[in-house]
Amino acid sequence: MSQSSIEAILAKRGDILPSPPAAVGFYVPVLRTGNLVMTSGQLPMLGKELVFTGKVGSEVTRDDGYNAAKICCLNALAQIKHCLGSLDEVRRVIRVEGFVQSAAGFHDQAHVLNGASELLVDLYGEAGKHTRFAVGANELPLNAAVEVAIWVEV
């Protein structure tokens, strides 16, 4: 299978689209209904390793949180590719939903989630601009620093 134009952009950026991570609970990692594809929350996994754990603002730096969100986004894109066959099938990114395991007094969740948002705009241009929420959370599954879900239109 030839590389899609979106995957070519990823490669040019030095980013690698991983294999889609397995679900860590009783749910499906990606679902298509009509012209919408949505992912379940993706964690900052590289292979089977959770690479950023703990609270952003104490155990994890703000910039590492940003990188964690980018990894979550790459995992979400891997799920979407698994569902569609190609990331070029995405017409528009609709929504990014993000949770940041935050230390008390950490209020820069928006910067952390920019790790996902900026990647999507770099890949899809205007069609990558999306609605978003960035929520501070006390705890996340497996002690992950960040969790991201994405909705796209196809």
Regions found by a protein language model. Give the residues of each.
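Short, polar/acidic, helix-capping and beta-turn segments at strand->helix junctions
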Residues: 1-154
